[in-house]
């Protein structure tokens, strides 16, 4: 299980192992079938590759273990998405820019290349497709986070819905959305629907 948390530190700050950058140990096991009120223990780190407009490299993620059930959780800084190398904030901002500016995908990629040299069409198309595939999960999470996210009236077609979703998240602030969505649903908004949280 991965739990997102707010942080004022940058990705660069997580490029070395430092416990002070992570929240303190949870006081209760987060797994529903355990949920024992016992302080979890530090259980080392794991490394993952992370790409953003400001950082490209390895970061370290703190792990904790439940002394009762033996399962681990990882504390994920808010700018990380579970199972994605690219920054969740950058993904939201890139897609928002694509839908808002109405520029071609080719032009958008040209603009992104100085900051994200490895990004290409397939990344952006994959992110667009995944959001559409996750529409029901995303809408469910948004409705739980805040009632004003409930779309009233007829169900808009996918592209219009994606644009509206990205506009609202961009106004709310991507950091807040990423952490709140993860805490509310136990998943990333980009999680594969075949995965169990």
Task: Kindly give the residue locations of the regions a language model identified.
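Short, conserved DNA-binding cores of transcription-related domains
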Residues: 1-81
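Long C-terminal interaction/binding lobes of large macromolecular proteins
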Residues: 1-11, 124, 136-197
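Generic alpha-helical secondary structure signal
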Residues: 13, 18, 49-50, 102, ...
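Short, positively charged, Gly/Tyr-enriched micro-motifs
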Residues: 70-161
């Amino acid at each position: 299980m991965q739990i997102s948390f707010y942080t004022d530190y940058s990705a660069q700050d997580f490029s070395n192992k430092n416990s002070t950058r992570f929240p303190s140990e949870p006081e209760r096991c987060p797994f529903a079938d355990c949920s024992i009120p016992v302080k979890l223990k530090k259980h080392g780190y794991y490394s993952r590759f992370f790409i953003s407009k400001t950082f490209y490299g390895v970061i370290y993620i703190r792990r904790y273990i439940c002394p009762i059930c033996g399962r681990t959780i990882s504390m994920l800084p808010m700018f990380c998405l579970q199972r994605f190398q690219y920054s969740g904030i950058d993904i939201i901002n890139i897609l928002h820019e694509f839908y808002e500016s109405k520029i071609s995908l080719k032009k958008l990629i040209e603009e992104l290349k100085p900051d994200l040299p490895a990004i290409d069409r397939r990344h952006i198309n994959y992110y667009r497709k995944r959001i559409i595939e996750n529409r029901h999960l995303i809408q469910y999470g948004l409705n739980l986070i805040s009632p004003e996210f409930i779309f009233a009236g007829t169900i808009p077609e996918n592209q219009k819905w994606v644009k509206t979703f990205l506009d609202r998240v961009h106004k709310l602030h991507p950091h807040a959305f990423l952490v709140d969505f993860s805490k509310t649903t136990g998943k990333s908004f980009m999680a594969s629907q075949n995965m169990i949280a």
